[in-house]
Amino acid sequence: MIKILALATLLISGFLPGVTVAQQAEYLGFRACTKCHDSQGETWRASAHAKAFDSLKPNAKSEAKTKAKLDPKKDYTQDKNCVGCHVTGYGEPGGFVSGASLDDMKTLVGVTCESCHGAGGKFRNLHGEASDRLKNQGETSERKQLVTAGQNFDMEKACARCHLNFEGSTKHDAKAPFTPFSPSVGSKYQFDFQKSVMTTGAGNPIHTHFKLRGVFKGDPVPAVRAKLQEDAPEPE
């Protein structure tokens, strides 16, 4: 069923003006990533991002919703003003589809790998080829090809899309629908990218950053990478 929904989305977008082939690259779901990045996947499953969709359910996060003037008893899982920041690829080819069976959408539920790194259909094969090249020939690959293909390296912008998208935001070009969870609701919503990304252990909102193997070389290198790699553990 999920393949049928994805195909329908692609067919529709193919007739929309201004939509290029590159923009039609599909979201693949987190399992396409964790087949290789299993250690990252395991720690992500315990994170707040993995459970983001659950917070839209009735009676979940009631205190926070009340402070933000939302109805804690309401089911927001189908609310188009909320869903986009709690699932992956909402409204995009291959992404989460409201109204579809959650069983079909299960690898797109929550803020997954592709929410930050971009639709895997654009660059997954390049990762596989580069890994094989390093393993078989001992050669590293240029990271620039990933940028050309569409992988996102501007992590801070990816975070700001939801965490700083409140009305009146001065740190992000906020656009409707705005998040109701602004700093005026509570200090915890004063999003700090550096602090959030550097958090380790049980409170990590994303996943543990493990030692990277040097499959790719060259720019761009996210500014936080060097710091994260200083004490990054080995993949399990």
Swiss-Prot record:
Q: How is the cofactor bound?
A: Binds 4 heme groups per subunit.
**Keywords per UniProt:** Electron transport, Heme, Iron, Metal-binding, Periplasm, Signal, Transport
Residues where heme 4 binds: H49, C159, C162, H163
Residues the record lists as binding heme 3? C113, C116, H117, H207
Co-factor requirement: heme
Q: Where in the cell is it found?
A: Periplasm
Give the range the annotation lists for the signal sequence.
Answer: 1-22
- What Pfam family does this protein match (any one)? Cytochrome_C554
Q: Which GO terms describe its cellular component?
A: periplasmic space
Respond yes or no to whether keyword Acyltransferase is given for this record.
no
Gene Ontology molecular function terms on file: metal ion binding
Biotechnological relevance of this protein: Has potential use in bioremediation of waste sites contaminated with perchlorate, a common component of solid rocket fuel which is a widespread environmental contaminant in water systems in the United States.
Share what the entry says about its subunit structure, partners included.
Heterotrimer of alpha, beta and gamma subunits.
What is the recorded function of this protein according to its Swiss-Prot or TrEMBL entry? Answer: Component of the perchlorate reductase that catalyzes the reduction of perchlorate to chlorite and allows anaerobic growth on perchlorate as the sole electron acceptor. The gamma subunit may be responsible for electron transfer to the beta subunit PcrB.
Q: Kindly provide the name given to this protein in its UniProt entry.
A: Perchlorate reductase subunit gamma
Q: Which organism is it from?
A: Dechloromonas aromatica (strain RCB)
